Amino acid sequence: EKRLNNIKSMLVEDQQRELYKNIYKKNKKTIPKLKENIVSYNATKSNEFIFSIINYDKSIKFIPIRGLTATQMTNLLLKSKIYLDFGYHPGKDRAPREALLFGNCVITNFKGSANFYNDVTVPNNFKFEEKFKNLEKINKLIYLIFNNYTHNFKEMNKYKNKILNENNNETK
């Protein structure tokens, strides 16, 4: 029965992944128009460093992804320009990939699979070691993305195209 649940879960993930790909393909021209200066972040993977980023500049609007319905999460990711994830990445992490398909620039760390460019194909200037000396650099990057979203989102093209072109069984 446990195996059946895993298979069900994989089927749901495959369907969800395809749904997100289709949402992106159908809305890729509209998505930039929906964007606001918001940073969404994975609250379940939050740590002291995330809270240091949030507290560094109180004028930035950070919204946690926690306790949201699928529709609420979709709406948040469609509005936010940035998805921040400084948790541990156990593999090809689903959350950053989905956030990217909803038009978010992904800022992450080097933990787990995020240390491997092939798994988390985010340019290195969007990846940071969790050191307090990097807070100013992260803050500057957030404002750079806010002020020039289109250019910065283009830097995610390799990661985005990789996600859009992979088969479902490649991400398991």
Task: Identify the meaning behind each predicted range.
Residues 1-73:
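Conserved catalytic-core segment of nucleotide-activated headgroup transferases in glycan assembly
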Residues 48-49, 135-141, 170-172:
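Well-ordered, non-membrane alpha-helical segments in soluble/globular domains
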Residues 60, 82-83, 115:
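Short, contiguous strand/loop micro-motifs
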Residues 64-67, 83-91:
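Glycine-rich anion-binding loop/nest that anchors nucleotide
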Residues 74, 93-94:
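Glycine-rich phosphate-binding loop at the start of an alpha helix
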Residues 75-80:
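Short alpha-helical donor nucleotide-sugar binding micro-motif in glycosyltransferases
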Residues 81, 166-171:
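Short, intrinsically disordered, charge-balanced linker/junction segments flanking boundaries
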Residues 86-88, 94-164:
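Catalytic binding pocket for nucleotide-activated donors in carbohydrate/polymer assembly enzymes
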